[in-house]
Amino acid sequence: MLDHFGIKCRAPEITVPFYEQCLASLGIVVVRRQPQFKAVTLQRPDMAIRLWIGEGDDAWKASAGVMRLHLAFRADSKEAVDAFYETGMRLGAEDNGPPGFRRPTSYEAFMFDPEGNNIEAIWQTERPFPRT
């Protein structure tokens, strides 16, 4: 289905390290660096799809009426979701929903990245979580 997706950013010196650090808690690591584009490619070793993040140009700049991205990254545990969110908050992300149970089978956290994209970490199970 998908091979990769890309995020072009206005401030790669902020956005690239932000993603590197936040996604590390989800097992997503840098597999390639492209200094000429101020870019990295990230991937989770057990998944084929890759994420490219790098410097944008005038053709990619957002304008009025352009919708930002919503990206959801799979987590393997509640603790990984918490670490993703805590790292983002420490790096200055804007909160868009703290870690918590959103549905009976999912634990999620949301934030806006430095470019204004809504990013999410989600841990899902087949059975409902016990409520306390």
Would you name each region that the model predicts?
Residues 2-11, 62-132:
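Vicinal oxygen chelate
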Residues 56, 74-76, 114, 124:
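Beta-hairpin (beta-strand-turn-beta-strand) motif
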Residues 8-50:
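Core segments of cupin and vicinal oxygen chelate
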Residues 49-53, 121:
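Broad, structure-driven detector of short, well-ordered beta-strand segments within folded domains
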Residues 55-61:
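Short beta-strand/turn micro-motifs at beta-sheet edges
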Residues 45-49, 59, 77-79:
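Short, charged/polar surface micro-motifs in flexible loops or helix N-caps
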